[in-house]
A protein has these predicted regions:
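Active-site neighborhoods and metal-handling regions in enzymes and metal-associated proteins
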Residues: 1-231
């Protein structure tokens, strides 16, 4: 505790650079800024941004209000860390939750729900169903769980997707969203990222997956890295 989001982002950047990240992330949508390390502690997680995502972060200044900011991590609040890495040209995207001290059971339950929604989306894609069907299934599950007004943002500032294809670029298609009436092709890679946002913060999970003949194969940490980690 006591460290700023930006200080923590610096540590994450060191690890990523040492693992081969070259410094740039390609985007298909132009012009679009992208902060590859989003760290949102507590109420920073509720701040919407110009970036089409559930959690944008406050950023270091008003000229670039995206990513980690000067908020300090406090005990008892969720800390969302979303990192984009590029390995030999190929993009991966991963989110995990952290906390210091006691984290309320309400937050833990919300994370469990997001994990379940991620499984629903993944299973739908793995069967070869359309990405729009995966979106609808995930969205309906969220509404049944009581997260309809907070899924991927606080209404009306909600991102309308639950996953995005990645490859040589961060924002490839298809997307798990309405209107993408086609499946993720065999060999296609998708970052699946259900998140729920409240005034006190954000919580969720993200991994990058590839569709195989047997279903969806995880390309990032998956079950090897816990969804919630206590410092």
């Amino acid at each position: 505790t006591g460290k700023t989001e930006l200080e923590m982002a610096g540590v994450a950047e060191d690890v990523s650079r040492a693992s081969g990240f070259g410094g740039s992330i390609r985007m298909r949508k132009w012009p679009m800024d992208c902060d590859r390390v989003v760290i949102a502690s507590g109420s920073s997680g509720r701040v919407p941004s110009f970036f089409d995502s559930a959690v944008g972060g406050v950023g270091g200044s008003p000229i670039s209000p995206l990513g980690a900011g000067f908020s300090k991590v406090k005990e008892g609040e969720p800390v969302l860390i979303d990192i984009v890495h590029v390995h030999r040209g190929y993009v991966s995207d991963c989110t995990r939750m952290f906390h210091s001290g006691h984290l309320a059971e309400e937050w833990r339950n919300r994370l469990d729900d997001m994990i379940e929604i991620g499984s629903i989306v993944r299973e739908t894609l793995g069967r070869g169903e359309d990405c729009s069907r995966a979106w609808m299934s995930g969205r309906e599950a969220a509404e049944e769980m009581g997260h309809g007004e907070n899924l991927m943002g606080i209404s009306p500032e909600q991102a309308s997707f639950l996953g995005h294809s990645v490859g040589l670029e961060l924002d490839e298609t298809p997307v798990v969203a309405d209107g993408f009436d086609r499946p993720l092709e065999l060999g296609g890679t998708m970052a699946i990222e259900p998140k729920v946002i409240h005034e006190e913060g954000a919580i969720g999970i993200e991994d990058t997956w590839s569709r195989t003949a047997e279903g969806m194969e995880c390309l990032t940490s998956g079950d090897r890295l816990p969804s919630l980690i206590q410092w």
